[in-house]
Amino acid sequence: MNKNNVTIGMGQLLVEGGEPDRNLQRACEMAKEASRKGCDILLLPECLDLTWTHPSARMEAQPIPGPFSDKLCQFAKDYNIYICGGLTEKCNDKVYNAAILINNYGEIILKYRKINVLVCAQEFYSIGNSLSVVNTPFGIIGVNICSDNYIDSLEIGHTLARMGAQLILSPSSWTVDYSLTETEDPYGEKWLKPYSILSGLYDLVIISVTSVGYIVGGPYEGKKMVGCSMAVDKNGVIVKGVYNELTGNLVIAEINVVPRDAKGTDIGKMLNRKGYYSHEI
């Protein structure tokens, strides 16, 4: 039986470029805090080991399973919590921007490789080629990463929803210009619009957690990550993280996972009833 009311820890983690030991230690502390506060799942950022587009990805990326993922698995087991987070994955001669979902026994139950990789990041990461979902005590969970949720790549979210996802977890590294201040809206409709479309059409919850800190090295050097992570359902924003440039923090989201009866071709009929006709796009 699935648990409909789920407590998600949104771990806005301070991530330093090329410093996996320090970053993973912070992830450990975040897992400990999330467990203490009663979270069922802890969601961590994209590329939490090395930072997104950091040049160290070429030489320091590790396989999955491997030393970095093993540490996250141990944290999940030690603190009896599900953990989803992004890692830089080495596989043969390729590097991927990957994410894993780990159960509370420390087992990897889903691995995903980012598909909608920005052009500037393609010198570091190869393109992923598959999507999957997994059944958990908290409903069916799908995983994607950051720009997979751009409005022009929403097919990725649609596919996860059609595969049954009731909850989409999206490790992210949302970057903004260094000059942006706390008084400004960092993202506008960039993320809220696609999240609202998906959650409204499928009655699912989508949650993205971004890192905080300044990017050092790579094509985005000098930009910063400022938090403001979001959890969104069909009614709008459930909770939003605080603006933060230098210090990580844990945000708690209480969500309701809604059963969905429509499957297969019935989903198309459901979407049509809601005024969404994919053939008109």
Which functions belong to the PLM regions below?
Residues K3-M10:
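Extreme N-terminal starter segment of soluble prokaryotic enzymes
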Residues I64, K90-S172, V176-K193, E245, ...:
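Active-site catalytic loop in hydrolytic enzyme cores
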Residues Q12-G17:
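Short polar catalytic/cofactor-binding loops
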Residues P20, L24-K111, W174-V205:
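Cys-nucleophile CN-hydrolase/nitrilase-fold catalytic domain and related Cys-dependent amidase chemistry
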Residues I64-C84, Y150-N249:
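CN hydrolase (nitrilase-like) catalytic-core segments centered on the catalytic cysteine
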